[in-house]
Regions:
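A charge-rich, low-complexity, intrinsically flexible signal that marks solvent-exposed coils, linkers
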Residues: 1-136
């Protein structure tokens, strides 16, 4: 549960419909990924990769690009529960992340290099296979 401690501390589950933080380790042949458009105080996109029972998460202020040459700032945020990949809805105003969350893309991903080392170094290498986004 320690992986989701920050996630749970920031939310009042009596007020938000977001899924409560619980790790969900599964024997998956394919690792899920999701991009959610988050119309919060600042419009941005959330990029999430399934890993070790949670969704590793980054905020992308300018949103994804279809051009592989484009660089995008990705700000690491707290891990989210696996069930968050299906979350769409409105987080109440005044709550952490208040605003509307909409699914923008989903699919699966494959690591190209060691994920734990990449997280430590701040550079993950992977390929995604989504409905909108595809590539390395």
């Amino acid at each position: 549960m320690a992986k989701l401690e920050k996630y749970n501390e920031k939310r009042d589950f009596e007020k938000t419909a977001e899924p409560k933080g619980a790790e969900k380790k599964r024997k998956a042949k394919k690792l899920h990924y999701v991009v959610q458009h988050h119309l919060a105080r600042r419009d941005h996109y959330d990029f999430r990769l399934e890993w070790d029972g949670v969704l590793l998460s980054w905020a992308i202020p300018k949103g994804p690009s279809f051009n592989p040459a484009d660089k995008r700032l990705a700000i690491r945020v707290e891990d989210h529960p696996f069930d968050y990949k299906d979350f769409e809805g409105t987080i109440p105003k005044g709550e952490y992340g208040g605003g509307t969350v909409m699914l923008w893309d989903e699919g699966y991903w494959e690591p190209i290099a060691d994920v734990e080392v990449g997280l430590e170094e701040g550079s993950l290498k992977f390929e995604i296979f989504g409905e909108r986004l595809k590539g390395k």
